[in-house]
Every structure is written in C-alpha cells, then in structure tokens.
Amino acid sequence: MALRMWASSTANALKLSSSSRLHLSPTFSISRCFSNVLDGLKYAPSHEWVKHEGSVATIGITDHAQDHLGEVVFVELPEPGVSVTKGKGFGAVESVKATSDVNSPISGEVIEVNTGLTGKPGLINSSPYEDGWMIKIKPTSPDELESLLGAKEYTKFCEEEDAAH
C-alpha cells in the first residue's frame, strides 16, 4: 500500500499519466554489445571461444551466439579421439529459433566432450563460458590462436555485426 501511494505521488509530481494519448515510437540504436565477453579467452568471428591452458584448449559458443540463438534444446558433439579442423564444423546446436553448426576455432584432437549438455543443453544459455563448454581438445597448431580475436576486438566485431543487421 505504501509503495502504491509513493508511486502515485511520484507520478503526480512528474506529471505522468497512464491514460496518455500520446504514443511515440522512439527510434534509437544500441552501439554496445550487451553480451558478456571475457578477458583471457580468444574468439572466432563465427562466435566460438577458446580457453587455452597448458596443452588443453576448451571450446564453446559465446554469450553473444547463445543470445541470438535463444533457448538451446539440443546439442550434437563429436566423440573423443576425433580430429577437428580450424574453421570446420564439429557439432551443432539446436535452439527454439534455429539449428547452427559449431565450427572449431583451432585444429586439434578432441580429448573430452561435455556430456552434461546431453541432459541439460540449456547450460549453454545459462553459463556459456563455464558449465556450457562443449569440447576440450589437444591443439595440433597452437599458433592458430594468434589469428583469433581478443576480448576488445571481439566486442567491436559484435557491435559492428549487430549494427549491420
């Protein structure tokens, strides 16, 4: 009740009315990528991320990608032992909006897959950089990491890509 009275008095003070007949459709552009982009990771223009630690690289799709896909309902992953090639598909993500191939940002051999995604594919939405990782590989060409984007470059890439659409 107190909150309702405060809201009413504030609306009166600001001359706000819920019965306003003026309907405006504001036009504005958002010049900032609102997705999480983490420092310390490398990013591919196809919206996959890589976390390289020692002889292992963990790969998943970015927060930006999962946001555009919507609710993820199914994930297809390769088997351990399979080789992946930079720029080539290694799996797929199916959402309520679309099915998208997932490309490997670097080449290597799959040493582990996130089996938790089988029962909970939504982990890609809720935790794309932690619980929603997809595969771990042993890179065959670690120098391929140098061609990927850092956090600032990826943020700029997303902003430009979103502005173009």
Swiss-Prot record:
Its cofactor is (R)-lipoate. Keywords: Lipoyl, Mitochondrion, Transit peptide. One of its GO terms (biological process) is glycine decarboxylation via glycine cleavage system. Disulfide bonds: none annotated. It comes from the Eukaryota. The modification N6-lipoyllysine is found at residue 97. Its main location: mitochondrion. One of its GO terms (cellular component) is glycine cleavage complex. Residues 1-34 form a transit peptide. Binds 1 lipoyl cofactor covalently. Residues 56-138 form the Lipoyl-binding domain. Belongs to the GcvH family. This is Glycine cleavage system H protein, mitochondrial. It comes from Pisum sativum (Garden pea). The gene is GDCSH.
